[in-house]
Amino acid sequence: MQENLKNDKLKIGKYEFDSRFILGSGKYSLELIKSAIEEAKTQIITLALRRANTGEIANILDYIPKNITLLPNTSGARNADEALRIARLSRELGCGELIKIEVISDSRYLLPDNYETIKACELLAKEGFTPLPYMHADLYAARAMRDAGAAAIMPLAAPIGSNKGLCAKEFIQILLNEIDLPIIVDAGIGSPSQACEAMQMGVSAVMVNTAIAEAKDVALMAKAFSLAVNAGRAAFLAGLASVSKAKASSPLTGFLRD
């Protein structure tokens, strides 16, 4: 089993990673970014392009170690065309071809627009990007995103920033059953135990932002999530026992009347 864990890689398109914990960077002070990355033991960090403005004195890229893979997102895009423009700008800034597609036209609930996200997947894939669409867990939309060129599917667990956990658990399970791409749970994970539960389901990775950024001790919470993700993955690989009725843990033969 130790060998299984050692060789267990997260594969996204042509990329491979040892860590299955993706760290968001949207709510941290710049001073806390580096310590959170170190304690999270992550290899991927998401990045809103507005925080990577190379014309500013305080640039988040200066606080992210060079060995970390950047996953820029299209935050702020309201449709597929806007997502494409942001992705192009990201590539011009040297952020690479991995891109998390975020298309949100609803400012109240901040739910992803699956229809525009499908269109964005197709547009970005045609331009050589490796798209990872953030989406509402829906099988038909996930199939369309896969067919449009998505390298992974990133369903929300609960509304972004809500910390409510796996509200969409049953729908995520359907994606796990039917979609032959990495399923990365994104948004709504509020505690290490929820991240562990998601990994136990068999998702490929978990992304967390708010629950760490708003913790009293950011670095320690990042470490807690990292341990939880690893524990959940190990439990999934080990094979969780599942029974439908009571089963004694000790033999009952020769006991009392027998």
Curated annotation (Swiss-Prot):
Keywords: Cytoplasm, Schiff base, Thiamine biosynthesis, Transferase. It holds the Pfam family ThiG. It is an enzyme of class 2 (transferase). GO terms for biological process: thiamine diphosphate biosynthetic process. Transmembrane segments: none annotated. 1-deoxy-D-xylulose 5-phosphate binds at G161, A187, G188, N209, T210. Pathway: Cofactor biosynthesis; thiamine diphosphate biosynthesis. The active site is at K100. One of its GO terms (molecular function) is thiazole synthase activity. It catalyses: [ThiS sulfur-carrier protein]-C-terminal-Gly-aminoethanethioate + 2-iminoacetate + 1-deoxy-D-xylulose 5-phosphate = [ThiS sulfur-carrier protein]-C-terminal Gly-Gly + 2-[(2R,5Z)-2-carboxy-4-methylthiazol-5(2H)-ylidene]ethyl phosphate + 2 H2O + H(+). One of its GO terms (cellular component) is cytoplasm. HAMAP family: ThiG (MF_00443). This is Thiazole synthase. The gene is thiG.
